[in-house]
């Protein structure tokens, strides 16, 4: 075994050659297995456990024979027989025939008696524990589990767990019968049964991919005397890849389904029913092989188990009914078909037929979908082989691309070809995402292109109309509110508009002029344009100036009362300046109220009359005794401080009239 392991590891080419031979020899195993499978099925049905133990042994032998290519038919014929179990143990070992005679003798009974009884029980107990339903249908399920459990478990589990396989290798090498019989069924079914789902999924796919050529694969084959299958596995990385796929996709999700479903299969008619489904599911070409191998080499499948358990699982994934197929040994046998030659063919076939699988499976969709799901589940980097299992290594490559590069571009392009069903789904979903975004982008360019034309050239004529509307008071209001902006607009338009509306523009500014006292700064702003215009059109200035003169006179008349007051105020101011010799601007520092308790008196000379409660405007603080004030009527005169009271409420209002000097009078007044 040690020699075989390195040999299998060393050359994948040898495995490939073995595969080719295997393919040629498969028809023979398929023919031979066809006959024995029936009795074996009967046995499996009746004595699922013993048969299982024997089948694993027999199956490995046919597969080994197929792999070895030298005695594929003889071994197939042997497989149906009971001696094949010894051959199985022997085959994995170095000298299949001699060891078959030697080991088979000792181990076969243990395997048959032990495996069916103990391993199957263990498996049943383990499986029943893990899968109570399996326990319910112990024997139908047991056979499946021994086949799938022992062979698949060992094969797949040893494959996933290289360490497990290595222990098996020593055991198998030393005691092929025992390890396959009890260690396989007892140890592996228990430990590795679910580990198969767990380990096979994560490890087996990857380890299988790498390990099929590696020793772990050999242990697997050793467990199920398949040195040649190992070469096949090494030579057929595709097989190993599919197996990982099966172990990952099928075993993890489907192994249990298988366990649950196999009950139905085993109890209902696991072997026959499962075989037909296998024939249906496995590619049609594999079907004959599956049919033959299923029964005679149901466990050769085990030897191929890396593929077989996974194919079984794969089938389970591909179809829930296939789970029944898995439940039936036929599944395992069909798997061997895939393993022995179908793997080679099936892998290529799976490129094409795998599509069949995937397509029927698409109907079941479980297979494809589970795989896409696995793809979605990056935890299944190993499942990448699953893609290979479906579509062969090329598909596996596509699977890697599709899984790892979940990116639609890579996976969608390569995978859809390999996977008509699963990849199409995944790719289809991805493409759906793509189109959604590009459409959004595509509309945008048109929008931008449309956006550029929207420049509004017709606006220039519009402003002319606006000016016509602004000619009335509205224009003046606009200028007052936005003098700077309006002024700029008018300045820009002056060359065109001035001939038509030069007077209006100046009139607008003239309207502002009356506010020179209150708002000198705006006046300056408004006058600036008029100055510029005057420079441009000096001849018009005289007429405009003439208009300005009457306008101030015209505006006051609008308010005759105000006009009279203004005139009185101006007259009083002139008299005040002459009388008090007051020079400079008249500024109101604050307002004060005459004390209501003060004595009233008439004014005379330079003094104002005192009226209780009257409010006076303080223009100057002449001395500590008197202040120069102005009454509401506009008369000026001195008022004694004693008669004045500060207006607390008016203090803030005073700020409006005179901010700078407001502070001084109060302290002085006080």
From Swiss-Prot:
GO terms for molecular function: lipid binding; protein kinase binding. Residues 31-43, 114-129, 515-528 have a biased composition (Basic and acidic residues). It comes from Homo sapiens. This is PML-RARA-regulated adapter molecule 1. May be phosphorylated on tyrosines. The keyword Phosphoprotein applies. It holds the Pfam family hSH3. GO terms for cellular component: plasma membrane; protein-containing complex. Expressed in peripheral blood leukocytes and bone marrow. Expressed in monocytes, and to a lesser extent in granulocytes and lymphocytes. Not expressed in non hematopoietic tissues except in lung. May be involved in myeloid differentiation. May be involved in integrin signaling in neutrophils. Binds to PtdIns(4)P.
